């Protein structure tokens, strides 16, 4: 396999070229717009440029399936270069045996599945890389990556994302970038503890289908599928609106979102029990809105997991955003001057988010709705489950 050393700028240029070939530009734009509607990133913010800046800070190398070449940063020290080489060689082997290039292709509306592929690929490569690093640091001990406690490993990855120039990136971007490395590796470690690398190979042969299965090994062992969830409708917004993007975020996406409003453990609890979800970004001229329906598995009763998640998210929003303008037992809403209304509701096993509408004109963002309209929209959403 050929290898090429590049400076950081040239390495990122290669990544940009790869992304431009694999991902339509509107996919990146729509992802950023949804994050802005949630309030996770500023309204005046170049999301794509910020993503590449964060990558430039973190990226040491990458394997390009299109030409079978490994590209590495030329400024790495010996230890970092050895670790990066080990990591990227695993990606090359994944491509040779399981056609990583085909599995990694962008598929509209299958965001959760894309995260599964990323988590399995990065978890496999990161686990092997840590084997190499531990063997170098503690030769002759026989220790491997699976001897690291899960919380210690996860904290090492998070610390790497929170240091250096990338530490200034919005929290949601850093946690999203770290997620496949953390949770994918924990999944791989769980497999290795059960059956060694053969168990990991079996996961490639019969891969997880949801990030819920990545986060909970027992869900993969049981082959528990995602529930079918219909896409949110938006007639309550009026005429002229159209779908810009429709996707599933998965349990991992829900956990990452909830961490913006609460501590990680609470976010894990609130997203646990995820059964399925569907979100839709809609636009009308320069106006935008987003709705997201998250359906929960049954617990002791049919709806108790959704009820607990709703209560936890409501408390998180109260703490982060302040008191709601409207607060009913199953509906809360805040009016935001620069992002439009933010409504949260629960109906049965569903927790529903309705964000916007908001005007996104170049002169500045401004609300284009209110909580009365949001209540109508939520009634439409819970009536069309």
Residue map of PLM features:
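Short pre-active-site segment immediately N-terminal to the catalytic Zn-binding motif
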Residues: 68-86, 113-117
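Pan-zinc metallopeptidase signature
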Residues: 161-286
